[in-house]
UniProtKB/Swiss-Prot annotation:
This protein's encoding gene: argS
Subunit relationships: Monomer.
Predominant cellular place of this UniProt entry's protein: cytoplasm
Catalytic activity from the UniProt record: tRNA(Arg) + L-arginine + ATP = L-arginyl-tRNA(Arg) + AMP + diphosphate
Subcellular location(s) of the protein: Cytoplasm
Record motif 'HIGH' region, residues: 126-136
Signal peptide segment: none
A GO BP annotation: arginyl-tRNA aminoacylation
Molecular-function GO terms, alphabetical: arginine-tRNA ligase activity; ATP binding
Protein name (database record): Arginine--tRNA ligase
The entry's keywords: Aminoacyl-tRNA synthetase, ATP-binding, Cytoplasm, Ligase, Nucleotide-binding, Protein biosynthesis
Classification via InterPro entries: aa-tRNA-synth_I_CS, Arg-tRNA-ligase, Arg-tRNA-synth_N, Arg-tRNA-synth_N_sf, ArgRS_core, DALR_anticod-bd, Rossmann-like_a/b/a_fold, tRNAsynth_Ia_anticodon-bd
PROSITE patterns in the record: AA_TRNA_LIGASE_I
Length: 590
């Protein structure tokens, strides 16, 4: 495995060295290198440096140009405007760099982080005994993409799925199951489907709720059962575990449909921190971070006030002795920092919970659990909207079941795949498999191509379109490239650095070389949408290249054909790897 220095980094270093030579007092000055439509790069840093040194910017720019060691990388540098530098790269440097990436297998020359840390990512957090709905989609999809991207950079990533598996509602459910012990029995099937598991839970929940609302004696028994659950009474815990296990059958079936890997050891729900709650509260109170207010243990903040102007506290422990969500979240922070040794905590959680997490993180900082060496941040996401721009609901105003949404996406995508299947020669099995890949990819990409914090419209017509910024467009671009190699005969992909590149080849090559630096930015900002934008631009540049630069017909010269096949293959591999990091599959034939 050999990492490859990007052309951007090579040019940046040469300019920085020349700047230091021309203006020693500037130290290691930043040339502020940017992509440009006037050349391959433009450097804008000289203007500010000249102003600081009371020098003429054009004169300083001319001195810098004279000191640049161009080598085989820089073809031309010109001074433009008040002191900008326009830099053009040699064709040879572009092809050599791409050849080095090509030789590096799946990593494509992308270096591993020099100083990897440990990041805990909290994402995909459904609730036990409750159906997953469209609101659960974004945390799962965004979180999984961030996990894949960080792991690719070499970070040690610990996944956590903080499922809602505790609370007073379990008293009602457990009591009903004790009185109706066969409600969660499976009808002789060796393997229960997720749909059947959820059907069992739904039926039991509705029956328990009806009884709870109509029978005072049952309500009393259910409330006593909550006390038993919190005390760890064995029979009660055994019944509670049945709900958790049945729910996991359902959860895992939905995540499997979403093509997400969820591992059982990574599922640590609210109950996983029960043994820490008392100590968390004690530590907060003893340190003075939390104080008693009307019998409750609270943390106050100067900048958090209610409509009446009075402070709104974070309630860690209620006046009746019960623990709030904050106690669980703060205990989870302690576990992740001190037991898992995390440097970074990422919470992929709805933006509507931002105030809660702001207060939780500030409390943890005051307690000394978070500091400059251990950071926590919420990767907040917006709402999924319908075509009308309103929160996505059924016509009856109900929340949409996630599994129904995914099934519809797969059905629509399968119809799109089937339209072209005969031309490509796909079997029925391939049509169904590709339909799943395209449908689930469409749902994921629509989410991931939007900045997480923004709301986005769920429009299946647009999502499965072959035109525009969709995963289907990218998947078809990949499949189209793979099909070229079936027509290439005895010609193979081979880099030819000695060849002059056409404008479309240069544009594609420069973009391919930016894959690593794009991933650096994406990983640093937890911004999968920037990777999606890179891949869409890659597919668009490839389309232009394919239209303008014949690969097979009319047949170009041998060396030109080999070099273009090399660009095709590297584009396909970059698309494949980039889409995989977003959790999207790329079928070989579409």
């Amino acid at each position: 495995m050999a990492s490859v220095t990007s052309l951007t980094a090579s040019v940046h270093q040469r300019l920085a060295d020349a700047l230091s030579a021309a203006l020693p007092e500037a130290g290691s000055a930043d040339p502020l290198l940017r992509r440009s439509d006037r050349a391959d790069f433009q450097a804008n840093g000289i203007l500010a440096l000249a102003k600081k040194a009371k020098a003429n910017p054009r004169d300083l720019a001319t001195q810098v140009v004279a000191r640049v060691e161009s080598g085989e990388v820089i073809k031309d540098i010109e001074v433009s405007g008040p002191g900008f530098l326009n830099i053009t790269i040699t064709d040879q440097a572009i092809t050599r760099n791409l050849a080095a990436r090509y030789e590096d297998g799946e990593r494509l020359g992308v270096p591993l982080a020099e100083h990897p840390g440990t990041t805990v990512i909290d994402y995909a957090q459904p609730n036990v005994a409750k159906e997953m709905h469209v609101g659960h989609l974004r945390s799962a999809v965004i979180g999984d993409a961030v996990v894949q991207i960080l792991e690719f950079t070499g970070e040690n990533v610990v996944r956590r799925h903080h499922i809602g598996d505790w609370g007073t509602q379990f008293g009602m459910l457990i009591q009903y199951l004790i009185e109706h012990p066969h409600e969660l029995d499976h009808k002789g099937a060796a393997e229960v489907s997720g749909e059947e598991a959820m059907s069992n839970l739904n039926r039991l929940y509705k029956a328990a709720r009806t009884l709870f609302d109509s029978d005072e004696e049952f309500k009393t028994r259910a409330r006593r059962r909550v006390v038993d659950l919190q005390a760890g009474e064995p029979e009660t815990l055994a019944m509670w575990q049945k709900f958790v296990d049945e729910s996991k059958i359902y959860f895992y079936s939905v995540f499997d449909k979403l093509d997400l890997e969820i591992r059982d050891p990574d599922v640590v729900g609210e109950s996983g921190y029960n043994d820490m709650l008392d100590e968390t509260c004690r530590l907060l109170e003893e340190s003075g971070v939390a104080v008693r207010s009307d019998g409750a243990l609270c943390v106050f903040f100067d900048d958090v006030k209610g409509p009446d102007g009075n402070p709104v506290p974070l309630i860690v422990k209620k006046s009746d002795g019960g623990y709030g969500y904050a106690a669980t979240d703060l205990s989870a922070i302690r576990d992740r920092v001190f037991n898992l040794k995390a440097n970074s905590l990422i919470y992929v959680v709805d933006a509507r919970q931002s105030l809660h997490f702001k207060m939780v993180f500030e409390t943890a900082r005051r307690a000394g659990w978070l500091n400059d060496d251990v950071q926590a941040q919420q990767l907040a996401f917006g709402t999924v909207l319908g075509k009308d721009g309103k929160p996505f609901k059924t016509r009856e105003g109900e929340t949409i079941r996630l599994v129904d949404l995914l099934d519809e996406a797969i059905d629509r995508a399968t119809a799109v795949v089937r339209e072209k299947a005969e031309k490509v020669g796909l079997s029925e099995q391939e049509i169904e498999e590709n339909g799943r890949y395209v449908g689930i990819g469409a749902v994921k990409y629509a989410d991931l191509s939007t900045s997480a914090v923004r709301d986005y419209k769920f429009d299946l017509d647009q999502m499965v379109s072959l035109n525009g910024d969709t995963s289907v467009y990218l998947q078809y671009a990949y499949a189209r490239i793979r099909s070229i190699f079936g027509k290439a005969g005895d010609r193979t992909p081979l880099a030819h650095p000695e060849l002059e590149l056409a404008p479309a080849e240069r544009a594609l090559g420069l973009h391919l070389d930016r894959f690593g630096e794009t991933l650096d930015e994406v990983a640093a900002e937890y911004a999968p949408h920037k990777l999606a934008a890179y891949l869409y631009q890659l597919a668009s540049l490839y389309t232009t290249f394919y239209d303008q630069c014949p690969v097979i017909k009319p047949a170009p010269a041998q060396e030109v054909a080999e070099n273009r096949l090399f660009l095709c293959d590297l584009t396909a591999r970059t698309l494949h790897q980039g889409m995989a990091l977003l959790g999207i599959r790329t079928p070989e034939r579409l």
